[in-house]
């Protein structure tokens, strides 16, 4: 049985390291691995020892914590209906009508059920653990995190107005109009800045038998980075914004202010993403001299919430060479530019385009973690871990006992 357990743990730790897949499970035997200190000699970890004191029961470890999520499995969390837009144009020719009147019952939300194509999250932090009786850890991390997210434009409700009849892109009628089309054939991606992050957790050995240890852990992590660069790519509208700002709450309702996207926009907020994650895990390890491989499972939930901020496409306040954006003309099957006495100059150009950063959350809750810890003189340790299924991630932890 012992040989079978050794073989299984070694195979999992080495095989999965070749295929790396947000929070690490960690080695379940970690609280009892470092039993001697670099500054103070370790004492008995047996609470039944009559000579033991509370000073002997407590020790402190510190080190480096690095966690790198290469692909978190996320989906957008939105309602099934989307309100505030005008009716979708259906006529073969001419202009869109009633673009200043919202649809009575809204329309199906094009973002509903959409998955993120890519979600990355990287953290580097200092690690500090309070150990009790060489069996239980209470730990925290303090550091910095940054992320990258990418999906189709449908997942972020890229919308605009097409077929609107007006004499100029600064027409007095434009502020009263509503977007009437959702752009699904496009890509939205954004990078966050590097922001302060922290986490707290506890880990303990529940059962020990010889060199085998079964343990459990709980963690909670949080960070609030801002979007550093937003990139929107589609045929009707394409733009890049550095440090974007937008509208939240009631001010994000359609129609947006006519100054939205210009340098004179007011009442805008920074695009801050609120990251929260909690996790519980269970793992089994087996010590082989200096090497302690382990395998575990976790259940986690992560959310990335930007308060559904709506960000308008950048544009000029007034026309230069008859344009305010770089959006192309979409002539369709016509052979001449629309005119209609000068009123249709905007009918073939997407106007008042904007996107909404929807809330994102975990699509898969369960995951598997495999890893190994290398120990030196019972004072220092280095841990490497890979995680699969609900994310593809790698973790590294180096620590020492005082």
From Swiss-Prot:
<dbReference type="GO" id="GO:0015288">
    <property type="term" value="F:porin activity"/>
</dbReference>
<comment type="similarity">
    <text>Belongs to the chlamydial porin (CP) (TC 1.B.2) family.</text>
</comment>
<protein>
    <recommendedName>
        <fullName>Major outer membrane porin</fullName>
    </recommendedName>
</protein>
<dbReference type="GO" id="GO:0006811">
    <property type="term" value="P:monoatomic ion transport"/>
</dbReference>
<dbReference type="Pfam" id="PF01308">
    <property type="entry name" value="Chlam_OMP"/>
</dbReference>
<comment type="function">
    <text>Permits diffusion of specific solutes through the outer membrane.</text>
</comment>
<feature type="signal peptide">
    <location>
        <begin position="1"/>
        <end position="22"/>
    </location>
</feature>
<comment type="function">
    <text>In elementary bodies (EBs, the infectious stage, which is able to survive outside the host cell) provides the structural integrity of the outer envelope through disulfide cross-links with the small cysteine-rich protein and the large cysteine-rich periplasmic protein. It has been described in publications as the Sarkosyl-insoluble COMC (Chlamydia outer membrane complex), and serves as the functional equivalent of peptidoglycan.</text>
</comment>
<keyword id="KW-0998">Cell outer membrane</keyword>
<keyword id="KW-1015">Disulfide bond</keyword>
<keyword id="KW-0812">Transmembrane</keyword>
<dbReference type="GO" id="GO:0005198">
    <property type="term" value="F:structural molecule activity"/>
</dbReference>
<keyword id="KW-1134">Transmembrane beta strand</keyword>
<keyword id="KW-0472">Membrane</keyword>
<dbReference type="GO" id="GO:0046930">
    <property type="term" value="C:pore complex"/>
</dbReference>
<keyword id="KW-0406">Ion transport</keyword>
<keyword id="KW-0813">Transport</keyword>
<dbReference type="GO" id="GO:0009279">
    <property type="term" value="C:cell outer membrane"/>
</dbReference>
<keyword id="KW-0732">Signal</keyword>
<dbReference type="InterPro" id="IPR000604">
    <property type="entry name" value="Major_OMP_Chlamydia"/>
</dbReference>
<comment type="subunit">
    <text>Part of a disulfide cross-linked outer membrane complex (COMC) composed of the major outer membrane porin, the small cysteine-rich protein (OmcA) and the large cysteine-rich periplasmic protein (OmcB).</text>
</comment>
<keyword id="KW-0626">Porin</keyword>
């Amino acid at each position: 049985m012992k040989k079978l357990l050794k073989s299984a743990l070694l195979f999992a730790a080495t095989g999965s390291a070749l295929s790396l897949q947000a929070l690490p499970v960690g080695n379940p035997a970690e609280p009892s691995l470092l039993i001697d200190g670099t500054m103070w000699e370790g004492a008995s970890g047996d609470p039944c020892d009559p000579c033991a004191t509370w000073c002997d029961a407590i020790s402190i470890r510190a080190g480096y914590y690095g966690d790198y999520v290469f692909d978190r499995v996320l989906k957008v969390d939105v309602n099934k209906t989307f309100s505030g837009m005008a009716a979708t144009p259906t006529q073969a020719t001419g202009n869109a009508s009633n673009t200043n009147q919202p649809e009575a019952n809204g329309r199906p939300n094009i973002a509903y059920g959409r998955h993120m194509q890519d979600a990355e999250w990287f953290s580097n932090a200092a690690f500090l653990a309070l150990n009790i009786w060489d069996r239980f850890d209470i730990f925290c991390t303090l550091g910095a995190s940054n992320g990258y997210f990418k999906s189709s434009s449908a997942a972020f409700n890229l919308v605009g107005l097409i077929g609107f009849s007006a004499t100029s892109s600064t027409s007095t009628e434009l502020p009263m109009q509503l977007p009437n089309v959702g752009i699904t054939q496009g890509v939205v991606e954004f990078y966050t800045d590097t922001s302060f992050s922290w986490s707290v957790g506890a880990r303990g050995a529940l059962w020990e038998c010889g060199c085998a240890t079964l343990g459990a852990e709980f963690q909670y992590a949080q960070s609030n980075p801002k979007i550093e660069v937003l990139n929107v790519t589609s045929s009707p509208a394409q733009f890049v914004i550095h440090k974007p700002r937008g509208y939240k709450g009631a001010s994000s309702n359609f129609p947006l202010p006519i100054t939205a996207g210009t340098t004179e926009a007011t009442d805008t907020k920074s695009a801050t993403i609120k990251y929260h994650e909690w996790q519980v895990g269970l793992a089994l390890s087996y010590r082989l001299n200096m090497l302690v491989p382990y395998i575990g499972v976790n259940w986690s939930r992560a959310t990335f919430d930007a308060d559904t901020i709506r960000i308008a496409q950048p544009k000029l306040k007034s026309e230069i060479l008859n344009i305010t954006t770089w959006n192309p003309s979409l002539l369709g099957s016509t052979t001449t530019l629309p005119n209609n006495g000068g009123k249709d100059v905007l009918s073939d150009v997407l106007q008042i385009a904007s996107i909404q950063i929807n809330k994102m959350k975990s699509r898969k809750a369960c995951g598997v973690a495999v890893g190994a810890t290398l120990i030196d003189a019972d004072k220092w340790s280095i841990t490497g871990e890979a995680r699969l299924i609900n994310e593809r991630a790698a973790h590294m932890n180096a620590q020492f006992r005082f």
